[in-house]
């Protein structure tokens, strides 16, 4: 299948894991060449080769272990013994990675290979900062912001289109910034829209409006 070496459509897939009071937001980005990137809560990142990417996807989709082993045999043309050995080793580490109750050190606690920094070239950023406005309710003399830039702001429909495009690019994390983003009346609606798409959202703010209980 064209651009589907694993038989799975490339893109970003979102999952949630909950154990008691603990939660993990998980994003798996599958690239066109079969490689994958796993992000946990938008702050932990793991690069996967095609076999690891396929196993990660099938585990997250809660596919039966025997079916996963058969899929590995079929896709990578390996014998059952090899597929079983690789799967057991990977699943042991992967279950720890995605567990909300565990926080393993990738270097000390897991049987994972490390990569030289910047040796991988991502197909898209892992985070996008969106400046909703350059207006601000502070007037700090040391601020780099220029008041004359506070014009030609996008409306809510335009920002939703931006968010849709960012998600389609495979970017799982957006941070709303400015200026002061809480000056945008429709900020809560943008956050809701981004979360419905599957994104993790963040906010760069001076916090003044957040001190108002009616705003929260």
Regions found by a protein language model. Give the residues of each.
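N-terminal [4Fe-4S]-dependent radical SAM core
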Residues: 21, 28-38, 45-47, 90-129
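Short capping segments at the starts of secondary-structure elements
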Residues: 57-67
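Phosphate/oxyanion-binding loops and surfaces in catalytic or ligand/nucleic-acid-binding neighborhoods
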Residues: 62, 97, 169
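Short helix-coil junctions and helix-kink-helix linkers
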Residues: 71-80
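Helix N-cap / loop-to-helix initiation motif
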Residues: 64-65, 79, 155
């Amino acid at each position: 299948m064209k651009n589907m070496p694993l038989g799975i459509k490339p893109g970003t897939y979102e999952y949630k894991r909950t154990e008691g009071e603990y939660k993990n937001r998980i994003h798996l980005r599958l690239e066109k060449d079969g490689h994958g990137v796993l992000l946990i809560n938008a702050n932990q990142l793991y690069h996967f080769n095609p076999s690891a990417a396929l196993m990660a996807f099938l585990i997250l989709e809660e596919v039966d272990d025997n079916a996963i082993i058969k899929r590995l045999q079929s896709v990578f043309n390996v014998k059952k013994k090899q597929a079983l050995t690789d799967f057991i080793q990977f699943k042991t580490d992967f279950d720890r990675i995605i567990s909300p109750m565990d926080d393993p050190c990738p270097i000390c606690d897991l049987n994972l290979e490390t990569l030289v920094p910047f040796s991988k070239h991502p197909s898209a950023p892992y985070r996008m900062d969106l400046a909703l406005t350059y207006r601000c309710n502070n007037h700090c003399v040391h601020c780099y912001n220029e008041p004359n830039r506070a014009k030609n702001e996008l409306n809510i429909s335009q920002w939703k289109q931006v968010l849709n495009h960012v998600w389609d690019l495979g970017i799982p994390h957006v941070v709303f910034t400015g200026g002061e983003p809480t000056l945008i009346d429709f900020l809560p609606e943008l956050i809701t829209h981004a979360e419905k798409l599957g994104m993790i959202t963040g906010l760069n703010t001076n916090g003044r409006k957040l001190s108002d209980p009616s705003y929260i």
